Amino acid sequence: LMKKKIAVLGSTGSIGKTTIDIIKKDKHNFEVILLTSNNNYQKLYKQAKELNVKNLIINNKKQYLNLKKKVKNKKINIFNNFNNFNKIFKKKIDYTMCAI
């Protein structure tokens, strides 16, 4: 069975965190393709590590720079704004949870 590919927009807020908790309980059925946050780069980084997410968007420029410093894995794509959705959504995503 193929894993369902998911994007979680606003993953560091309360709805986003609840969504992530549900996904973690059923990891064999889901693959998170994208996580986004407005400001909370530390929580975004933690979620990306836990779920092996390769695409992150953080809207705040200062927090983007902090996240870039923190992420040592060059295989993780980090974007500073939502203009990069087109690049990411060329990948197949089955579900998008919009918690923003």
Ranges and model annotations:
Residues 2-54:
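N-terminal Rossmann-like dinucleotide-binding module
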Residues 9, 35, 59, 79, ...:
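Structural motif
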Residues 18-21, 47, 66, 87, ...:
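Alpha-helical scaffold segments in soluble metabolic enzymes
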Residues 1-3, 72-73:
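Generic N-terminal leader/processing signal
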Residues 68-100:
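A structured beta-alpha segment of the ubiquitous adenosine-cofactor-binding alpha/beta core
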Residues 10, 14, 39, 62, ...:
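Conserved active-site and cofactor/substrate-binding residues in soluble primary-metabolism enzymes
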Residues 43-80:
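Conserved N-terminal catalytic core of the sugar/cofactor nucleotidyltransferase
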